[in-house]
Amino acid sequence: KKLEETGHTAAFSDAEFQRILIHVENHSVYESAKILRDKYVLELDDGNTVYIDFFSSDTTRNIYQVTHQVTMDPDHKNDVVYKNRYDVTVLINGLPIAQIELKRPGVEINEAINQINRYRKFSFKGLFRYLQLFVVSNSVQTKYFCNENEMANGQYQPILKSLVFFWTDEKNTRINELH
């Protein structure tokens, strides 16, 4: 229950934290990215106002975490349709920003892309709407793609294969194995 607050970290009351959650949850992917870049003006319980940066431009002040096998279960979360287990999730300051789906060598990379499309449609809810980047790998190929908004009618459009790119280094040399 701590967020960075211009220069220092402060604990928020349950009511203050709830206001922050309401501000960040259930937006489109684009709106979520904008919220992460902007300052949030929070009125504290005592009437004072603070400006919250969700990410610091000084990257050393952010907290980076990696989770393994996070499970979303409809028995525990009402807006999740199917039970899913995500391979690797990268969080910055507690917000999920990147999702990595790993497959065994020999498994087609498109299976990982299709799996993420299912996750996007049925289980990436709440704070998982903040996912901005997906990485898929089978140790033979490694590719990445950005998350995108649902269509105007609220339906999800699958990630287009033409918008999935090979992972490369700064000289545009393909990187296939993740270490």
Tell where the protein language model's regions lie, with residue ranges:
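An alpha-helical interface "stripe"
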Residues: 1-179
